[in-house]
Amino acid sequence: MVYAIIVAAGEGKRAGFEIPKQFVKLNNKTILRMSAEKFQNSASIDKFLVVSHRNYVDLTEKEVKIFSKFENVVIGGSNRQESVYNALMYLGKKENKPDFVCIHDAVRPFVDTNKIDESIYKAKEIGGAVLAEMAENTISQVNNGRIVKTLERSQIYLHHTPQTFDFNKLLKAYQKAEKILSSFTDDASIFIHAGYETAIVEDYKNNIKLTKKEDFELAKCIFELNS
C-alpha cells in the first residue's frame, strides 16, 4: 500500500497573502486542491493524508474531502520536519501500515502524475527516490560572499517533491534524527543521514514551489500554457 502525505501546514507569510498560500486560487481552484487532485489521479497512490496548521484544519478538510483517496487531516508541528513526522507517527499507529510513503509539498501544484508514479516505481526498486531537476547554471560554493570553488554542475540536482520512501525505513530515519530534525531541509536528507540509498528521478522544470508572490505570477503563466 502506498500513502501520500501532502504537507500544507505552513502559514505562507513570505508570499504576502492574507491567507496561507495553499488556499490561494489559480483559475478558481486552490493550490491545495490542485495538488491533491494529482495524487487522486495517480494509479500508484492508494490513500493520502494532508498535514495542516491547526488553525486551518476545517478549511483544509473542506478542500480535499471531495477526493475518494483522502483519509484524514493531521495537525502539523512547528516546522516542516515536525509536520511530516506527525504524519509518519499517525501512519505508524495504523493496523495496516503503508509499504511506501510519498511526501509532497502542497505548494507544488504542477507535479506531473506520471512522475509521481515513476518516483514510486524507483523507490520500490531502491528504497528511496526524489524528483529532482538537473542544474543548468554554473554553481559556486561561497564563503562570506566570496566564491570558494565552482562545483561540477553535471553532479548537481535541485530537489523537488514528491519524495518517496520505504515507510518503515523513513520512520526509523526520523526517529533516529528526532533531536536534530530542524537541521535537515527535506525528507531525503533525513533518509540519507540514516544510511539508506536514494535515487534521483529527473523531473520537469515546471514543478515549481510557490514560495513568494512572484512565484504565483509564474504559476499563472504555467497554468495558461498547460490549459
Swiss-Prot record:
Residues annotated as site: Positions MEP for the nucleophilic attack: R153, K209
Site positions per UniProt: Transition state stabilizer: R14, K21
Tagged with keyword Ribonucleoprotein: no
Gene Ontology MF: a single term: 2-C-methyl-D-erythritol 4-phosphate cytidylyltransferase activity
Pathway note: Isoprenoid biosynthesis; isopentenyl diphosphate biosynthesis via DXP pathway; isopentenyl diphosphate from 1-deoxy-D-xylulose 5-phosphate: step 2/6
Enzyme class per UniProt: transferase
Name of the molecule in the record: 2-C-methyl-D-erythritol 4-phosphate cytidylyltransferase
EC annotation from Swiss-Prot or TrEMBL: 2.7.7.60
Statement: the UniProt record of this protein carries the keyword Transmembrane helix: no
Catalytic activity: 2-C-methyl-D-erythritol 4-phosphate + CTP + H(+) = 4-CDP-2-C-methyl-D-erythritol + diphosphate
Superkingdom of origin organism: Bacteria
Encoding gene (name): ispD
UniProt record similarity statement: Belongs to the IspD/TarI cytidylyltransferase family. IspD subfamily.
